[in-house]
């Protein structure tokens, strides 16, 4: 089980409290689809994904991004208990959504980059390290029930 | 995988800004790498890795200078980095997974320093460019 120090938890929660989760969610999912276009394979029903501006302006992308990032908020409230927190979601991603867990790592890294653009200097190497630990642990938790 | 004209333009124009902070970007990228991915320190047992160390600064400059060489010869990255490719294949033998980690930390650094320039399109171009650089550096591994 991953253990987060008090400093790591503080680094995570302080930035999270300043984030507009709705906007950031759309940005994160949008960037995933732009930077790693093969991830679009999961979103055939989303309509126009033909260009970066189409993707970032797409209302379905924004809505789904918000959903994903809101769920990430659960991770932050349960940093000591991620595997249990994401057990059901893990089963869903395996059995119904058929998502390769590699994609969780890609999204995690995109989120880290978005945090960097929003927080600039405040996103110090130490703060980044705490977030990398979190996104990695969430990715592992989401893959935990795969079979 | 090769870069489109648009992607090359994005890289080259951003590099003009980046090169003015090249040395600090290099050092900070390595700091981020060692903090976020401590296993990468195993390649530097001979270094003083404390933030601000002279060796870190020198090595950071080296790394960013090499990226700069790739930018300046963006139409022929393989040619520009041929010697460096041999160095990594025969002497350094850094496991290929680490190039992704270093690339990510450089992107984080660019995103933090140039948020307005680091649009989704620029992010995609840089990710792809660093992926090409990484491929060149590992292409002689076996």
Swiss-Prot record, chain A:
Belongs to the globin family. The epsilon chain is a beta-type chain of early mammalian embryonic hemoglobin. The keyword Nuclease does not apply. PROSITE patterns: GLOBIN. Residues 3-147 form the Globin domain. GO terms for cellular component: blood microparticle; haptoglobin-hemoglobin complex; hemoglobin complex. Heme b binds at residues 64, 93. This is Hemoglobin subunit epsilon. GO terms for biological process: hydrogen peroxide catabolic process. Red blood cells. It comes from Pongo pygmaeus. Keywords: Heme, Iron, Metal-binding, Oxygen transport, Phosphoprotein, Transport. CDD domains: Hb-beta-like.
